Each structure stands twice: as C-alpha cells, then as structure tokens.
Amino acid sequence: MRLGYFTMPVHPIGRDWSQTLREDREAIILADRLGFYDAFVGEHLTDVCENVTNSMLFHATLIHDTKTIKLATGTTNLSQMHPAVIAVNAAMFDHLAQGRFIMGISAGALPSDSEAIGILDQDRNKIFAEAIDVILAIWERDPPYNIDFPDNRFKVAINQTAAPHLGVGAMAKPFQKPRPEIVGTVVAPFSPGVVLMGKRDFHPLSANFLLATHLKSHWINYAKGKAEAGQKADVKDWRVARTIFVADDDKTALRYGREDAKSPYRFYFEQMGAKMKRGNRLYVFKSHKEQPDEEITHDFIMDHCVFHGTVNKVVDQILAMREKTGDFGELVYAGMDWLDPG
C-alpha cells in the first residue's frame, strides 16, 4: 500500500500567511524524504484559513526541493478558470515536474469563491463537466482544435489567427502520455459522480472527513463505472484519506489529537463541522441518512474521524477500517496546522 499526503490546508485565523505557506511547503518536503508517493494540496480564493489560492502555483515552488514525490493539485477548481488556461498551465507544470504531476479536479465547493468571480448562481457541476471535456480535447487534438461540444459553453478554435510557420496557434500537451493521472476528491456517501469517474478512468480519493462507514460506497460506485466502460476496477487506483495522529503514548495522542482545546485536530474539525453545517452538508458526518443533525456534535465527529494513539493502536484502527472498506491502493494522511512543529 502506498502512503500519500493531503492538506487543504487549514490554519487558525490570524496566523501569518507567509509563515503558514512556509510550513505547508516544509511538510511536503518532509513527506518526500519519508518516501510518500504523492502530496495533494487544496485551493480556495476567499478563505483566510485555507491559505493556498492556487495549488499548481504552490507546487511549482516544490519541484526542485523534492525528489520523488508526485505533486498533486487537490484540487484544481475547474469552474474558476477557462479550460484552455487550465489545460496549458497543467501541461507546462507536467513538463517542469518531468511527470511528477497528478491533476486533482473538482467543481469548487466554496460559495464565496463563486460569488467573488460572479458564478454563484450558476451550476458549478455543469461548468466542471464542460471544462474537463474541453481540457481533455485540447490535449488529444491538434490545431486548429475546433472544439464545439453540444450544450457546452466553452468553444475552442484557432482558425483566424494561427501562423504555424511562426509557432503561433498551438497549445502545449502534457509531458506524460497520453495525459497525467486525473484524481477526483469524493466527499458524499454513495456519490454518483464516482460512477462517472470510473467510466472515464479518473481515480477517486475518498475525503478524510467522511465517516469510514461510507467509504465502501465509493469503491462500489467506482467499480460500477469501470464495468460500464468494459473495464475492471483496480484497487491501486483508490485513495482513502484519514486524519491520524501517532504518539509514543496514548495520553499524548489523546491530548494532542483530540482533547486539548488548542489541538490542531480539534480546530480542523471545528472548522469543517461549522462549514459543513453552514453549507447544509452535515450528511458527510452522519452514520445513517436519518440521523438527526443534533447528534452531530463536535465530539461525535472527533470520535468517528480521527485515528489517534500509539503506533500499534493506530495500526489496529486502520486495519479495522480496512475490514469495512476492503482493500485500497493508498492511505492518504491529512495534514494539520503546526501547533507544535516538534
């Protein structure tokens, strides 16, 4: 099983932006030295706690400070930029990283981001679906492209201004052939979007703040999509993220990983719980669909979403989870704020 790293990141309000960016870089450099396979970094335009505004730009600073770890957007929010821009930026990044690039994609879930760029009232999932079709077409086709899909707002063609003898009118293709690995973060239990991911050979990453009870539903839907495409799903393509704290003794693990008022794990899930409630998405923390919102307390979330303890205890928790989920290809460690860098 591979080990991966994912961070949104989430830092307390008021922390120095430059300092948190340095810490987030250092965490990935350490993950590279420890042999982690990949590192996913999220992005938001309008959240001071989640400090990375462009994950591709952030990762570009790490290319020459890391050796083997794959640098993954986690995610590039496809509703926030024209797909032609995303396609060529991703292609360039893939060349800069010499193939150490994974393209994580999503529609972008933060409403304030959408409001800032004037798309709050639009269907971001539809924009996402249209954008990825165009990105893939740009990578697959040659000039003049003439991309004009039905019911798709994005039309891409370079007919009037091309000058092939000058190199004008062509867009870059990725370093990896036929394209980089594409990964989608999955949050909702029983998400139908995972079926579509299977059909298109995109790979799922199950979110660390989803109850383990629901993880199996992601694999079932992914396998269904692969079968509908005439292919067999491979467990190596499924990533499962979890929130984990390991200490030398259970007392320290309980304090830092759960009980202490200053615990970065507690802060993280206070943030996530409040944001999910505000967005009417508390269902991600529910053990069953009919569970009342009142039962989704902070302690309930911590009890179900954080593995903490000594090495052996945490290993037992991971193995118990795997009994429910079945095999998966990568365990993705969720990064927290650095309350105590030691």
Language model region names:
Residues L3-Y5, A39-V41, L71-G74, F101-I105, ...:
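Hydrophobic faces of well-ordered beta-strands that scaffold small-molecule active sites
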Residues D32, H59-K67, A90, D94-F101, ...:
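Acidic (Asp/Glu)-rich catalytic clusters
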Residues L3, G35, E43, L62, ...:
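Conserved, mostly hydrophobic/aromatic
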Residues N125-K173, T213-G326:
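An alpha-helical appendage that flanks or caps ligand/catalytic pockets
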Residues H82-R200, S217, E228:
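Internal, glycine-rich beta/alpha segment that forms the wall or movable "lid"
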Residues S18-L30, A188-V195, V314-M321:
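Short, acidic/polar
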Residues M1-T73, R179-P180:
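N-terminal beta1-alpha1-beta2 module of alpha/beta enzyme domains
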Residues T7-R22, T76-A84, P178-P189, D303-V311:
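Active-site mouth loops of central-metabolism enzymes
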